[in-house]
Amino acid sequence: MGAQIILSEGFEVVPPPEMNDLVLFGSNQSVSSCDVSTVTTEDGTVFSGDSSPGGATEEDFPEEKPFSFYFVKQPAYDDPEIKAKIDEAGHEINRYNKDRIVVSNAQESEKAEILSLFGQMKSLVSKSEGYRVVIEEKKMEFDALHESLRNLRCSTSDQLCFSKEELDHLIYIAHYQIEHGSIGFEEEDWVLKETEKADGIVLSEDSLAEKEASINRVKSMAVELNEVKKELDAITWKINHLSDKVGKSQNNLRVLDVKKAHILEERDRSYERIKMLRIQRDKGKAAFYQSLPVMRKARELAASGNVRDLEVFASSEADRFMTQWNDDKAFRDDYVKRISPSLCERQLNQDGRIKDPEVQVVWEKKVPVKGGEKVHETNREDSSSNSSQYGSVITDKRKKETRKKAMDFNRSSAEESDVTDLEFSVYEKPKKEEEEVDEETLKEREREEQLEKARLAMERKRKLQEKAAAKAAIRAQKEAEKKLKECEKKAKKKAAANSSSPSESDHSQEVTKDLEKVRTLAVSGKEKHQKERSLFPKQRSFRYKHRGRGTEALPKAILNRRKAHKYWVWGLSSAALAVALFLVVLLLR
């Protein structure tokens, strides 16, 4: 059964259908930290605790009254920190997925390139095999021709076939040896016989033509073999170049595999982090999940019409909530944190009161705080505080009026308001409007400013007089100390003589009189200073200087006098000791 939730003095209430004249009254006390909800029956009655089940007649209920039971609502709360971390992990996963897609595309391109290179290498290998077969055949033909030529030229020593130039050369050598060498007649005859045999062989022209034909054939075969070898070398160079490219592509493919594995590992870590964060978020929503069966049970009891059980159940839940609220501070803080968004939706403060409409509700804009602002003087602060009191009274009156208007407006338009946007409120100071001030207030302000100025002038004058009196007292004290020092020096000089004349006694009396005058002057200066301080009582200042109080330092002249007195005593005692030692030494001799 769906029902519209409306506002009634800070509570969430479900109105019964077809009851336009129904008015729900909440408690007058402000419920600051509890969101409440009600349950209704299928007949449209809002239960509050005294009605009987749904089979009642009009005689039992002469006056139809709605009964409301309020349950503590545990709204769902998403921790912004956890939500930000989950969003960040989701962005990381998206980035890793994009990187994985890029790496996969690069791997596919590398694999396609390797396949194309393998295809080129396969065609070149088949060509190289064909060229190798041709070379083998040419070599076999060349060897056969070479063998036939060899058989033709030198089968035996008697059947040698020489050309005409070779025979002429041999004849020339033989004649030269005969003319210049030491060869006998028998050897000469043998050489002549050999030459004659050769002359007989030269006459065979068929063998010479066959020889020339075989030589030409061998030369042509050699040229063809060289061309085939060059083509085979070019093909092998291309195959080696392609194999190098394949090796580089395979290395790149391995690098991409490692990179992809690293990306997948990081993505899995992000998935694990998201799982942990979601578990943490669900733990934070445990109260919301626990409240769901409570509300379900309450709706079931309301639908069945079991009012007394519903009343007992509502009171037990309220008692349980209040015990947790009173005993556990962490529970209170958690519930306040959960309820704050709902309060912002309903334009309520944390104490349950409706917000002031003049207050600007802005959470997204944060006011920048400047740390290096200068501190104004206390006197100016006093004057500004006095002058701002009158404006604050007027603004307070206007605030009260606007609050009353806002309360009436919210009560009248509670049924029509349906807040869906979640706003986070930050309270800022309202802007000061230009206010019309009466002449009497202006005169009062001017009079207060003049009084403040007079007070400040008197305080300055008092401080100057205190400083002058202190300086005069210090000066008189210094003069007195000087005179005392001079008198002590004169007394020391006169103490050396045993007898004193009457003139000297008169002089000492004058010195004592002068000392008494100096002392009286110093005392009178101090009394005058104290009287001046009593005439101008010191007003309270806002500048506090906490300084530790130590012993007051003695004047320098008194310290010097004490030192001189000590030196004189020590000098006399040391002189007496020296005289005694001198006498002892004389007696011992």
Curated annotation (Swiss-Prot):
Protein name per its UniProtKB record: Proton pump-interactor 2
Record's keyword annotation contains Repeat: no
Expressing tissues: Expressed in seedlings and flowers.
Annotated source species: Arabidopsis thaliana (Mouse-ear cress)
Record's function text: May regulate plasma membrane ATPase activity.
Membrane-spanning segments: 568-588
Location of this chain's protein in the cell: Cell membrane; Endoplasmic reticulum membrane
Ranges annotated as biased composition (Basic and acidic residues): 370-383, 395-408, 426-450, 504-534
Lineage, highest ranks first: Eukaryota, Viridiplantae, Streptophyta, Embryophyta, Tracheophyta
Family: Belongs to the plant Proton pump-interactor protein family.
UniProt keyword list: Cell membrane, Coiled coil, Endoplasmic reticulum, Membrane, Transmembrane, Transmembrane helix
Family annotation (InterPro entries): PPI1-4
Coiled coil: 205-245, 431-500
PANTHER family: PROTON PUMP-INTERACTOR 2-RELATED, RNA-BINDING PROTEIN YLMH-RELATED
Tagged with keyword rRNA-binding: no
GO biological process: regulation of proton transport
GO cellular component: endoplasmic reticulum membrane; plasma membrane
Mode of membrane association: Single-pass membrane protein
Annotated stretches, region: Disordered: 370-450, 485-534
